[in-house]
Amino acid sequence: MNFALILFILTVITGIFWIFERTVFLPQRRRKAEEAASAFEAANREALGRGDAAVGEDLRRLKATALRQPWWLEYTAGLFPVILIVFLLRSFLFEPFRIPSGSMLPTLHIGDFILVNKYDYGIRLPVLNTKVLEMGAPQKGDIIVFRYPMDESVDFIKRVVATPGDRVEYRDKVLYVNGVEQAQSRPRDFVDDSTMVTLEERTENLSGLEHSIAVDHRRPSWVPMQAVMKKESTCSYNDRGFVCTVPECKYFAMGDNRDNSEDSRFWGFVPDENLVGKAVCIWANFSDMGRIGSIY
């Protein structure tokens, strides 16, 4: 479901009703309210002259009834300001997402609700996703949300491990960027609550940014070369891992749950035009509210 498109359509439809409400329907109701009030005052001039409170209240209710929006305008024009604010916030500032899988463990858990910054990587037109203003670019270590290159109706979340021009290598479960080993330290046990499997949690220093990764010793370090990657002349695979050089305007992204993540190793690079934004914090997890906070 393309929620951005649905929200855009709702904004346009309610906006049209709001314009007609302001320019046509509201002036009509005001005119009718004035006519009804004039007729009522003419018929009850004596009582109003005496200051009859009951008649005065009837006049007030008459005006309020004549000015009241019909239900179909309440649910269209009346909702437009709220829908417009949501649309603008979601399109240009922040968008919420829910983590559906364990591919980013131990950093992000299933059920985490995260907030994604929509402007760090440039201002884009809603729905079209066309960049109209350059702001910045993903850096190594950023957790990004992007449209899955194999099915752009689906959003993925992974960590950027290499940027355009970088040579990235994953060998024997260790990451190398431009020939430099991204050091791993402090191994300890980590239990994946969704599968009840014990993984090894390590701290990886990715170009100066320390973050947690999970290693599954039940799985090999190599991954089968998918058909899409066979077309990439800058990548090679062997029984110990792979080596890739990242093309311009593309990024290499991997899940922190290194052996249980379908990522750039399988389906290729993330194009710049597929970027949605940068994950900045966890704002809710209804199973564990203690997880609320920054993810860096």
Regions found by a protein language model. Name each.
Residues 2-50, 57-72, 98, 106-296:
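Soluble "head" domains of membrane/secretory-pathway proteins
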